A protein has these predicted regions:
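PLP-dependent amino-acid enzyme catalytic core
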Residues: 1-404
Length: 404
C-alpha cells in the first residue's frame, strides 16, 4: 500500500495527514493488484471488516452490524418518475442510522492503530453519532465539535453514546483550513486522533465508505448505469468511484457507472464548480440549506474529479423538493429517510428531462440516513394531528373522517 497524490503522483509517508506537500493535491491510499484482487473472492458475511485489506488499517474494525444494507427496487416512485429500474441503497439501516457508520468503524480502527486515547471530529450530525457509537464500542473517548443549529436528534444520539459534545460557533465558517486547524490543534492537545471525515484533511477514513460500492456490485451483480449520491464534503461520492475502480481492476465488473452528485442550490460549491468548468471547488462564504446533511460550504475537488472521470453530472435541487420526496419515500415506498437522503431522488425528474439518465437504465440512489436523524417534517405532521380536536366515539364519525 502506498499513499500517493492524486494530482502529481508524489508518494507521501503512510500516516500523513492533510494535502500533498509538493502540489497541494489530495492524498489517497493505493493498493497493489494482488490486494485489490481479494474483491473477486471475498466471502459474504456480516460487517465491513472482511474488506480490511482494502482499508489503510491493521486493527480490526469494531462490528455493530454495519454494512450489508438492503438494495431495494422502487415499488412505486420509479414508475411515477418514468424509470423502469430504480433502486435504493438504504444506508439508514446502519447501527446509528447513516452511512457514516462505515466511516465510524474505520476511524476507530485508525485511532487504535495510532495508539490514541480517543478521537476528535467536527460534524454536522451523522459523523458525530457514528464516531460516538463506534468509540463506545471500542472503549475510546470521543469529542465532537458540533456546528450549532443541527437537528437535536443527532445531538441526543451522540450524547447517549457517551461522547463529549461541544458546540463551536463557526466551526465550518472559517473555511476548510480553519476547520482542519482546530481539529489538529485539539487532537494534539488531548492526545486524540484527528478524525475529520474529509479526504483533503484525512485521506484514510473514506476508504471504509467504499464498501457501499462493493455491496451494490455483489447484489446487482455488477455496476449500475448511474449512481446518484447526496454531496456535502464529497467523500461519499468519491469513495464509491474509488470502489468501482477497484472492482473493475479485480475483474468483478466490466464497466463503470456514471456518478451523479446532488447538492442543494442553497449550498452549492460542487454544483458551481462543475457548471463553471473549474478545476478546484471554491469554498463558499455561506451554506444556507435547510437540509442538514449537505449544508456544507466546501466540497473537495476529489468529488469533482470523480464526476468528470465517470461522465456524470452534478445536479442542484431546491430544499422543498427534497422535503416533498422525503414525504413520498415514506408514503409510497415505506422508507423513512432524512432530507439529505431524499436529495438524490428529488434530482431524478430534472436528470431525466435533461437527458442525463435514461428511462431504461439501472439507477441506484444512495439513501444516506434514516428519517429520525432530521424529523422536522414528521414533527410538523404530528403537530398538525395533535392540534385537531378528537373525534367522538362513533363509527360513522371515524369512517367519515377517514374518507375525507
Amino acid at each position: 500500500m502506498k499513499l500517493l497524490c492524486a494530482d502529481c503522483r508524489k508518494e507521501a509517508a503512510m500516516g500523513t495527514l492533510g494535502r500533498c506537500g509538493a502540489c497541494d493535491g489530495i492524498l489517497r491510499p493505493e493498493y497493489p493488484d494482488e490486494v485489490v484482487a481479494v474483491l473477486a473472492t471475498v466471502a459474504p458475511g456480516p460487517g465491513i471488516d472482511r474488506y480490511r485489506p482494502l482499508f489503510p488499517v491493521t486493527a480490526p474494525l469494531p462490528f455493530l452490524g454495519e454494512g450489508d444494507t438492503p438494495l431495494l427496487p422502487s415499488a412505486r416512485l420509479g414508475r411515477t418518475l418514468g424509470l423502469e429500474r430504480l433502486l435504493f441503497k438504504n444506508e439508514g439501516l446502519n447501527p446509528s442510522g447513516a452511512f457514516k457508520d462505515r466511516a465510524g468503524a474505520t476511524m476507530v480502527a485508525l485511532a487504535l492503530d495510532a495508539g490514541a486515547k480517543g478521537l476528535v471530529t467536527v460534524s454536522s450530525g451523522n459523523t458525530a453519532t457514528a464516531a460516538a457509537t463506534y468509540c463506545a464500542a471500542a472503549g475510546l473517548r470521543c469529542l465532537i465539535l458540533l456546528e450549532p443549529g443541527n437537528p437535536p436528534a443527532k445531538l441526543r444520539q451522540a450524547l447517549a453514546m457517551g461522547a463529549k459534545v461541544l458546540p463551536v460557533e463557526g466551526v465550518y465558517a472559517h473555511g476548510p483550513d480553519g476547520t482542519r486547524d482546530i481539529i489538529f490543534g485539539v487532537a494534539e492537545g488531548l492526545g486524540y486522533y484527528p478524525a475529520f471525515v474529509w479526504a483533503p484533511v484525512n485521506p484514510y477514513i473514506l476508504e471504509g465508505i467504499k464498501s457501499v460500492s462493493y455491496e451494490i456490485a455483489a447484489r446487482l451483480p455488477g455496476a449500475p448505469d448511474v449512481l446518484v449520491c447526496p454531496v456535502g464534503g464529497g467523500d461519499m461520492l468519491t469513495a464509491q468511484w474509488r470502489g468501482y475502480l477497484e472492482l473493475q481492476r479485480a475483474g468483478v465488473i466490466d464497466r463503470l457507472p456514471r456518478m451523479v452528485g446532488v447538492q442543494s442550490v442553497a449550498a452549492p460549491p460542487l454544483l458551481e464548480a462543475f457548471r463553471n468548468g473549474d478545476a478546484r471547488v471554491t469554498p463558499l462564504p455561506y451554506a444556507r440549506s435547510r437540509i442538514s446533511g449537505i449544508n456544507v460550504p466546501f466540497t473537495g475537488e476529489h468529488a469533482l474529479a470523480a464526476v468528470r472521470a465517470s461522465g456524470g453530472v452534478v445536479a442542484g435541487i431546491a430544499d422543498e423538493d427534497a422535503f416533498e420526496i422525503q414525504r413520498r419515500l415514506g408514503a409510497e415506498e415505506g422508507i423513512w429517510v432524512e432530507p439529505a437522503s431524499a436529495a438524490p431522488v428529488a434530482a431524478l425528474p430534472g436528470l431525466l428531462a435533461e437527458g442525463h439518465i435514461g428511462s431504461h437504465e439501472t439507477v441506484v440512489c444512495l439513501l444516506s440516513g434514516a428519517g429520525f436523524k432530521d424529523a422536522l417534517l414528521a414533527a410538523d405532521m404530528a403537530d398538525a394531528v395533535s392540534a385537531r380536536p378528537p373525534l367522538p366515539f362513533d363509527v360513522e364519525a371515524v369512517v367519515s373522517a377517514a374518507l375525507a
